[in-house]
Amino acid sequence: EGNPHCHVILRGGKLPNYDVANVKICEKELRGAGIIENIMIDCSHGNSEKNHFKQLNVLDDVANQIAEGNNSIIGVMLESNLNEGNQPIPDDLSEIRPGVSITDACISWESTETALRQFAKSISGATSNRNLKSRNGN
């Protein structure tokens, strides 16, 4: 049977794939395969062209898609940490800056909070009656 609450994550690749055209392609492919059209957008990675600041542009675009009536986008992912940026792992671990990623560059907690509050405000009217779609209708 599988997970009735499954979703696809669009994270980009060589090019971003969070835009309206690519979301529609994903919806069509899922529908054609008989899979529920639940899509999550990764605002980082290929969709931000690995520039952590561009995550906010992706998030704004996704908010617009939802506000304009898209019902298949069920969530977003952001790369976030207490402080922005990233750092290499130093030989002397006491030099690690707390709250700064040691992998991909992240937006700061302050930027994250501001962005998510704006995102919620932007989509509030469009999401008040939405439910997560599942294979079994629950």
Predicted regions and their residues:
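Expand to "…catalyze enediolate/carbanion chemistry for C-C bond making/breaking, isomerization
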Residues: E1-G137
